[in-house]
From Swiss-Prot:
Cellular compartments annotated: Host cytoplasm
Naturally occurring in which organism (per UniProt): Indian citrus ringspot virus (isolate Kinnow mandarin/India/K1/1996)
Protein name as it appears in the record: Movement and silencing protein TGBp1
Taxon lineage: Viruses, Riboviria, Orthornavirae, Kitrinoviricota, Alsuviricetes
GO molecular function, one term: ATP binding
GO biological process: symbiont-mediated suppression of host innate immune response; transport of virus in host, cell to cell
Further details from the record: TGBp1, TGBp2 and TGBp3 seem to act together for cell-to-cell propagation. TGBp1 is the main movement protein that physically cross the plasmodesma with the viral genome. TGBp2 and TGBp3 would facilitate TGBp1 function.
């Protein structure tokens, strides 16, 4: 099985863009890119796959990733790398790289996540990011000054990072949470969240959980789904 056949077997859909090298694969957070690459490495042990981001794989296999970008024919998180002419496929979650001049138009896409659930997927869709899920989860929006954090705290901007530090919270910045997954998360945002105020940092924070996410903002009405 070649990589294109594997993509299609995992519900990655071809776009109308004519194929050209490198073939670009875009997927929402939690769509299973790492599992896809591990499966391909199992089928094709000679595959040379590169990622610039440390991976936390649950696979019993040794990591399929090579340390050499120059020898890779598949590159994950490609906006972080300088691509050489021999690269066959490149992959990324494009929303994590909003505004990057290195984003390419995709030949394959997957808007379905296996990480979080319907409530978060519907919320992301309301923010303009088409997302689907196969399971339930819980999303709560509450006031940052009236609600205790639950699970891993992710502070999305300087104001909330300073607030978290003053309260001695064990928090992560969004960039520190890339490649990580938690059962429950609380994300701190210093402003109202809507399509106009959504940033890649907030998107990253919104997509780290498997069970529940609590969004804390100033003066937010308490809602849950």
């Amino acid at each position: 099985m070649d990589f294109a056949e594997l993509l299609e077997s995992k519900a990655f859909t071809r776009t109308r863009l004519p194929l050209s090298k490198p073939i670009v694969v875009h997927a929402v957070a939690g769509a299973g890119k790492t599992s896809l690459l591990e499966n391909y490495a199992r089928i094709n042990p000679a595959a040379r796959i590169y990622t610039p981001i440390a991976q936390q794989s649950n696979s019993l296999l040794l990591s399929p990733f090579t340390q050499s970008l120059e020898q890779a024919d598949i590159v994950d998180e490609y906006p972080l790398s300088t691509l050489h002419p021999g690269v066959e496929y490149v992959l990324a979650d494009p929303i994590q790289y909003l505004g990057s001049k290195d984003l390419l138009k995709p030949h394959y896409i997957c808007p379905t996540t296996h990480r979080f659930g319907h409530s978060t997927a519907e919320f992301l869709t309301s923010l303009g990011i088409e997302t689907y899920a196969h399971k339930p989860d819980r999303l709560t929006i509450a006031n940052i000054f009236k609600t205790e954090p639950h699970g891993q705290v992710i502070a999305c901007d300087l104001d909330t990072q300073q607030l978290a530090a003053r309260h001695s919270l064990d928090y992560l910045r969004p960039c520190q949470s890339i490649g990580k997954t938690f059962k429950d998360t609380t994300i701190l945002i210093s402003h109202e969240l809507n399509r106009d105020t959504l940033t890649k940092e907030i998107y990253i924070a919104l997509t780290r959980h498997t069970n529940s996410v609590t969004i804390l903002t100033p003066d937010a009405p308490s809602t849950s789904s």
